[in-house]
């Protein structure tokens, strides 16, 4: 390394620049703890419609939750309390 190379800024390759930007985006998303998808209320409503075709059910008896376990794992949990009697 010559003395001029030491003081001259080194050019970044497009690959290293893209990698750096991607790392920033990933870190930002991790810090935000991505909220649940926007379609969850509609999904719950659709599930209620399907269940109500077969069983009289109160909307409070259906619980739909979404959580992130890891960076690449998300869990959608559906709990339905069914009544003893059918329609």
Swiss-Prot record:
Stored SUPFAM superfamilies: Cell division protein MinE topological specificity domain (SSF55229)
NCBIfam families: minE, PRK00296.1
Alphabetic keyword roster: Cell cycle, Cell division
Pfam families linked: MinE (PF03776)
Family: Belongs to the MinE family.
Functional note: Prevents the cell division inhibition by proteins MinC and MinD at internal division sites while permitting inhibition at polar sites. This ensures cell division at the proper site by restricting the formation of a division septum at the midpoint of the long axis of the cell.
Protein known as: Cell division topological specificity factor
Keyword Cell cycle included in the entry's annotation: yes
Source taxon at top rank: Bacteria
One of the protein's GO biological processes: regulation of division septum assembly
Species, as recorded: Vibrio vulnificus (strain YJ016)
Entry annotated with the keyword Cell division: yes
HAMAP family from the UniProt entry: MinE (MF_00262)
């Amino acid at each position: 390394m010559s003395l001029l190379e030491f003081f001259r800024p080194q050019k970044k390759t497009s690959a290293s620049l893209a990698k750096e930007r991607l790392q920033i985006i990933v870190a930002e998303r991790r810090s935000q703890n991505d909220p649940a998808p926007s379609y969850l209320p509609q999904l719950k409503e659709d599930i209620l419609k399907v269940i109500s075709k077969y069983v009289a059910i109160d909307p409070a008896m259906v619980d739909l939750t979404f959580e992130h376990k890891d960076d690449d794992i998300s869990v959608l949990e559906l709990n339905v309390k069914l009544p003893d009697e059918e329609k």
